[in-house]
Amino acid sequence: PALIEKFRQERLSIAGEVAKLSQEVQAFLSDVKTERQKQAQEQATALRXFFLQV
């Protein structure tokens, strides 16, 4: 029984770590997406201004 309880605790610990890592990955991807959208908007604005000058 002690060994089974140890395995159960380890499984819960691993599941918790996986959930935490998943949240961190999602936050990172969200930040990357936001930054890429910002860069795309800046590039579009610069391109628009370039065409207006031509």
Swiss-Prot record:
The sequence repeats are found at 18-50
Name the lineage.
Bacteria, Bacillati, Cyanobacteriota, Cyanophyceae, Oscillatoriophycideae
UniProt superkingdom: Bacteria
Q: Which organism is it from?
A: Microcystis sp. (strain CCAP 1450/13)
Q: What is this protein called?
A: Gas vesicle protein C
Gene Ontology CC, one term: gas vesicle
Question: Where is it localised?
Answer: Gas vesicle
Q: Does the keyword Cytoplasm apply?
A: no
Regarding protein family, the annotation reads: Belongs to the gas vesicle GvpC family.
Q: What is its main location?
A: other
Q: What is the recorded function of this protein according to its Swiss-Prot or TrEMBL entry? A: Confers stability, involved in shaping gas vesicles, hollow, gas filled proteinaceous nanostructures. During planktonic growth they allow positioning of the organism at a favorable depth for light or nutrient acquisition.
Q: Which UniProt keywords apply?
A: Gas vesicle
Keyword NAD in record:
no
The UniProt entry, under NCBIfam families, shows:
gvpC_cyan_rpt (TIGR02641)
Give an example GO biological process: gas vesicle organization
